[in-house]
């Protein structure tokens, strides 16, 4: 058991690619937590996708032992948090487990939107914040400009900001000294009933469900019976341990310590991030504030390209859900694509990561339908239900009203790109809330429909700003809207996989776009193929694929016009009969390309 006066719990918060995981590597190296043989880049990022994309997806923790210059040995608990907006709830719960934060900012890039969002979460949790300016060895580094941004935009005193290079190791000893002397020790009562916050959970093939937690009060011991306050579920603790970053079993965790337990838990859904864990026989009175169950906000359907892979896909989704309780899936069927699953995600990055993991780790070939958001639909009987699948949307005469989710977005961009960003936001039905300037940077606040953002808003934002704009957002309630179900017909047959829910103002343009794309993708047939976009009985767009035409009059010599007319009439009847009995063979690649929606 460790005395709380020598414990420091801290998180590293930063925008994507500002050097957060690299700094964690240098701290682990400086504290000799791993041998040279075991040390690798982004040691806390366990997934290949995390390393390749340079992002952190799952919150990770490591206990480091540091002998400070004052002769005291400190125990540092580092929580490496995700930086992307999709995982912002994970960040807020990780920050609730700490007393301080290292605010890492790229000294050449400056403050960005997600830096802002995460530092405000740290301030809400009463964190002591140490500002660290990374990449100070670069020629483009401008520490003074970034310090003034920190003071003007965030409102923190940047006079004590540390200049470091996580890549070369410059200034790492200063960071460690700042952690032990500038960040506070945890406060708690070891004699009070056990109270611990659940930071993360995942599935381990040997240990079962592993819970990462921080003890606030009391002592957590092996063999203790513990209860989850949100679900009331009771378990007996089998193992208690810490990450150094390798697993190390211990007898107990006391006030301020961060570690893991296993307790024979079978379902990851029982372990909700942010939940309070307490001793069953002596429960704490009040749970940690701010707990909420994470709900998917973006949905799409995943179908295996090879129908025989359906069971393999079901198993793969089940395994991913063991590590990610915010991800949901339900079976569905499509006449065009066969059997698949309707999946729910926290955002577009979450969707991309899950799809990439399915394809890479489980060797699956998948078709994904267009992403959709959750609409609240009130029917004429005044019954409200949530709809995210176009096939579940009632007919227009059955609908009394519809509400769609809107987001509050914060965009930071150099002022020379402001005009393009404003035009982009307005084209997405956005409403400007605020605009302020700090030096050459514009801080823009907008409200936007989530349905407009999930398609390609982030890509368009980066494109019009040459990659300089940064975005942070959160769902900010529901707003009444007018939507339509756009149905795609091929030779008068509806294709359910291409149906989508769209705002009424975008119906014609989106319908025309899909029809034009399908015209290029569907092979020509022996007969004419009509591709139509419809809303109810009204056709809003149409494209026609011309048939192949065999020259049946080639063998007719001379000027026998009646013979030619007879052959042409016979060909016309044959094509008419062929059209009535023939199905248009739409290749799988056509669905995939048609569903890659771009404005």
Swiss-Prot record:
Signal peptide limits: none
Main location: membrane
CDD domains for this protein: EF4_II (cd03699), EF4_III (cd16260), LepA (cd01890), lepA_C (cd03709)
Name the record gives this protein: Elongation factor 4
Catalytic activity as recorded in UniProt: GTP + H2O = GDP + phosphate + H(+)
Domain of life: Bacteria
SUPFAM superfamilies recorded: EF-G C-terminal domain-like, P-loop containing nucleoside triphosphate hydrolases
Any one of the GO CC terms: plasma membrane
Gene Ontology process terms (BP): positive regulation of translation
């Amino acid at each position: 058991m460790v005395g709380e006066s020598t414990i420091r719990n801290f998180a590293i918060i930063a925008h994507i690619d500002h050097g957060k995981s690299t700094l964690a590597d240098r701290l682990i190296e400086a504290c000799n937590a791993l041998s040279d043989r075991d040390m690798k880049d982004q040691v806390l990022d366990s997934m290949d996708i995390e390393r390749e994309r340079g992002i952190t997806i799952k919150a990770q923790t490591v206990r480091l032992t540091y002998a400070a210059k004052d002769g005291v040995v400190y125990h540092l608990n580092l929580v490496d948090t995700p930086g992307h907006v999709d995982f912002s709830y994970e960040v807020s719960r990780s920050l609730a487990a700490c007393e301080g934060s290292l605010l890492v900012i790229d000294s050449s890039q400056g403050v960005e939107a997600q830096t802002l969002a995460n530092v405000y979460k740290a301030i809400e949790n009463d964190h002591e914040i140490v500002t660290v300016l990374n990449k100070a060895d670069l020629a483009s580094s401008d520490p003074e400009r970034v310090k003034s941004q920190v003071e003007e935009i965030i409102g923190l005193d940047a006079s004590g900001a540390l200049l470091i290079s996580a890549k070369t190791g410059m200034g790492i000893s200063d960071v460690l000294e700042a952690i032990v002397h500038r960040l506070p020790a945890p406060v708690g009562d070891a004699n009070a009933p056990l109270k611990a916050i659940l930071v993360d959970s995942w599935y381990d093939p040997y240990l079962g469900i592993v819970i990462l937690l921080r003890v606030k009060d009391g002592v957590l011991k092996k063999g203790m019976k513990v209860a989850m306050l949100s679900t009331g579920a009771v378990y007996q603790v089998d193992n208690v341990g810490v990450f150094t970053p390798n697993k190390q079993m211990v007898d107990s965790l006391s006030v301020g310590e961060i570690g893991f337990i296993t307790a024979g838990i079978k379902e990851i859904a029982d372990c909700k991030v942010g939940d309070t864990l307490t001793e069953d026989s002596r429960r704490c009175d009040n749970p940690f504030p701010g707990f909420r169950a994470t709900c998917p906000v973006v949905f799409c359907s995943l179908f295996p390209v090879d129908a025989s892979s359906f069971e393999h896909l079901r198993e793969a989704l089940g395994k991913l859900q063991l590590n990610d309780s915010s991800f949901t899936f339900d079976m569905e069927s499509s006449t065009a694509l066969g059997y698949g699953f309707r999946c729910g995600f926290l955002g577009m990055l979450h969707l991309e990561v899950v799809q990439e993991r399915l394809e890479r780790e489980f060797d699956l070939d998948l078709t994904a339908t267009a992403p959709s958001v959750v609409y609240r639909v009130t029917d004429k009987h005044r019954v409200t239900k949530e709809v995210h699948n176009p096939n579940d949307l009632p007919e227009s005469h059955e609908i009394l009203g519809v509400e769609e989710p809107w987001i509050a977005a914060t965009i930071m961009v150099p002022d020379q790109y402001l005009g393009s960003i404003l035009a982009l936001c307005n084209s997405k039905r956005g409403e400007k809330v605020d605009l302020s300037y700090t030096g050459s940077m514009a801080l823009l606040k907008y409200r936007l429909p989530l349905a407009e953002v999930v398609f390609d808003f982030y890509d368009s934002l980066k494109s019009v700003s040459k990659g300089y704009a940064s975005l942070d957002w959160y769902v900010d309630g529901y707003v009444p809207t007018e939507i339509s179900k756009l149905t795609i017909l091929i030779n008068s047959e509806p294709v359910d996989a291409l149906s989508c829910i769209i705002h009424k103002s975008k119906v014609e343009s989106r319908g025309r776009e899909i029809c034009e794309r399908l015209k290029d993708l569907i092979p020509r047939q022996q007969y004419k193929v009509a591709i139509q976009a419809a809303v109810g009985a009204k056709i809003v767009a149409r494209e026609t694929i011309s048939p192949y035409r065999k020259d049946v009059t080639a063998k007719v010599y001379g000027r026998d016009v009646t013979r030619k007319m007879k052959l042409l009439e016979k060909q016309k009847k044959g094509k008419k009969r062929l059209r009535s009995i023939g199905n248009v063979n739409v290749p799988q690649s056509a669905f995939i390309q048609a569903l890659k929606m771009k404005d």
